[in-house]
Amino acid sequence: MTQSTEDTLLRLAGVIDSRKGGDPEQSYVSRLFHKGDDAVLKKIGEEATEVVLAAKDVRQGGAPSALVGEVADLWFHCLVMLSHFDLSPADVIAELERREGLSGIEEKALRKRREREANGG
């Protein structure tokens, strides 16, 4: 990820954070915050489904730009969810950086070992 990409995510997160106490009649994001986390989570589920459908369309010759648009919608709503739980894109980026260089198999084994240790096993 380039610095400008990270900056874009952080700027967008700042705008989203600023909508937390906003008027739900004036802002879509404020409306989502006002409705609570279940509304945000439902929207993420809808957007994730739309990503899957758009990807299947691309596989069949559909427009890749439609997939990009759906992923943008999903990422946006994930940013709203992160903000709702007082998290930021920086938290996700840090986790991705932590995992970088680990194979998926190694990462999963490490996670299982940590879970066992946390549960006294």
Curated annotation (Swiss-Prot):
Pathway noted in the entry: Amino-acid biosynthesis; L-histidine biosynthesis; L-histidine from 5-phospho-alpha-D-ribose 1-diphosphate: step 2/9
Originating species: Burkholderia multivorans (strain ATCC 17616 / 249)
Subcellular location(s) per record: Cytoplasm
GO BP of this protein: L-histidine biosynthetic process
Similarity comment text for this entry: Belongs to the PRA-PH family.
MF (Gene Ontology): ATP binding; phosphoribosyl-ATP diphosphatase activity
Protein name: Phosphoribosyl-ATP pyrophosphatase
GO cellular component: cytoplasm
Source species, domain of life: Bacteria
Keywords: Amino-acid biosynthesis, ATP-binding, Cytoplasm, Histidine biosynthesis, Hydrolase, Nucleotide-binding
Catalytic activity of the protein: 1-(5-phospho-beta-D-ribosyl)-ATP + H2O = 1-(5-phospho-beta-D-ribosyl)-5'-AMP + diphosphate + H(+)
Gene symbol of the encoding locus: hisE
